[in-house]
Amino acid sequence: MTYAFDPLVPRDIDRPSPVDVTRPLDEEASLAMDEAKIFAAPADPAERPAWRRRLHEWREDSRRRHAYRGERYAHPDARWAAGCSTVAQVWLWDELLFDFTAQRFTPERLVEDARERFGGLDAVVLWHAYPVIGIDQRNQWDFYRDVPGLTDLVEDLHRAGLRVFVDYNPWDTGTRRGRDDATELAALVADLGADGVFLDTLKKADPELVARLDEARPGIVLEGESKLAVARIEDHAASWAQFFADSDVPGVLRAHWYERRHMQHHIRRWHRDHSEELQSAWLNGVGVMVWEVVFGVWVGWSARDSATVRRMVRIQRAARELLIEGDWTPLAPLADAAEEAGVYASLWERGGVRLWTVVNRGDHEWTGPLLSGASSPVVTVPGRGIAAVAEADDESPDWWPGLARAIAEADHDRDDDARFPHRPARRIAPPALPRDDDAPDPGPGVDLPEGPYALTVRYRARETGMYQGAPYVDEWKPLPPRLHDARTLQREGLLAGRVRVAATEVTAGEFRRFVEESGYRPLVPTRFAGDEGDPDAPAVLVDLEDARAYCAWRGGRLPTEDEWQLAADDPGFRRSEPAVWNWTESEHSDGRTRFVMLKGGSDRGATGSDWYVEQGRQSADYAVKLLRPGLGLGRSTAIGFRCAWDLDENVAPHEEER
């Protein structure tokens, strides 16, 4: 197969835009500059004064053309966004934020981890539905509304000093329909007390949606994905600078140059080296999105990049007034030796204070005079790193001592370890539940012999990946056919003893009998199977723990995903009506995300978007990686289960994986 693009290099739309200073800034040239993500910088220092003048000319002209007022940024409830240096996108069920054993949120763990490694967060996006949505007819609002204690979680995060974004998925049109999206989102924002809305896949919100959200939460901060149109900087206080490629000599972010109070968050979600994003953020006085778990995949930041964030935000927070209101000189003149070493700086000036935010594009540490002249300060800049130099006149503002202290502290906080912090997913041994020795005979099933096996597993390449590792590494923008295409993997293992897999799924009537006779009560009853419905239909609205408990009551256990597949090839293996996905004993965790493998496919589910979990009956060799939600949200009308029994005594119940 020949790909139409190289995923390891930026696409044309990701690249910085050159600035033509050889002709007057007419309407055509000004409109062209409106479309930039980053204004590319000239390599020749002699060309930079004209380049800076052109940036000023464009900003003045563009603001005139768009009749810019900037009222959004003056709103008391929106001002915080201008100082939001770090935002983290966090899956609600990230194991830093949620304890699966206790079934409770643990915001204190998330906050402490971020403080130690990143210098603390300013905001979080509570990601909720994707990539689980589509497994059944629940819509994106259900995946917030059904969460017990979500309002308490938001309040806890607020008490910890963090702002909270909720996520809006405009592509969710194939699940159950309720009220229109604007009504649902506005109500959610009001009920949770959310500070902002992250606009998934949207560069900007419709004006009507903005108005509805403003009614629910005056001053609401909207953050779109990717490039924000100049005209909408007026009512979007932040934007997501995703996959913004910089020029070799660092350039200027167009949206932030247009409005210094507009916060942008750099992010290249699949990259393992974030130094270029961090340097661009540092030189432009903006922030970054710290995103270490991308839809269930670990993409953790290196110790070097984490330390860079700590150093950066310590100074940015101390210098916020200077960075927003001071005079900004991009690519300020430096000593020739610094320029030759690939060292560049922005200069920020206000109230007799001068701050140089410095970056080193080279791979090796550089030490030398920053400026021309004998009185120049000497600076050390780590390879691929940042530094800061500041000086003040005798009459300095009251924030100057805090800034000087922050710079001194940052100088002692660095780490040169740029290795990727791998985090393998491990299979979780199921809890040892008491089995009923008097349970009736398992009944009809498919008997699997002991011994080795090899399987081919088919799956769709989603952003969730499969068992280990990220599906994309250092890729700019995964697109079809790299995204959502059909793939295979091979699994090898050993059955240590004979296993019988039930011929059919457990029925709703059988599960009700279990609940009545055993007195079983789940730790969290949210969405737990009710007493109504066809007793001969497959049991649904059962979580993994519920299914395990039932099978133990029957003297068995859940089959592993491999046992399920081996049995499903036998003519005696049957599917119930309607078909539902089957839980398997395949729970894994990398310490941040829990997932299982579903088998079988379902007659239920959502259609209309590739972002949904696939629906429809699937072949025996097909698998879906499902991220585990907590607090009962794993209970689905489209997921049932069947049991398995070990036919030989004193045999470990699970196969070895290789």
Segments from the language model and where they lie:
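Active-site neighborhood of glycoside hydrolase catalytic domains
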Residues: 149, 156-159, 172-240, 244-249, ...
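Structural recognition of the beta-strand scaffold that forms the well-ordered cores
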Residues: 88-92, 122-126, 164-166, 196-199, ...
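Extended beta-strand/loop cores of jelly-roll/beta-sandwich
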Residues: 396-563, 568-569, 621-658
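Alpha-helix capping/hinge segments and adjacent helical runs
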Residues: 586, 591-624, 633
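Mature N-terminal, pre-catalytic/accessory segment of carbohydrate-active enzymes
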Residues: 1-122, 379-382, 393-439, 649, ...
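Aromatic-lined carbohydrate-binding/catalytic grooves of carbohydrate-active enzymes
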Residues: 110-206, 519-533
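Active-site-proximal substrate-binding groove within the catalytic cores of carbohydrate-active enzymes
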Residues: 43-48, 52, 217-219, 223-369
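Short, well-ordered junction/capping motifs at the entry into regular secondary structure
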Residues: 562-577, 589-597
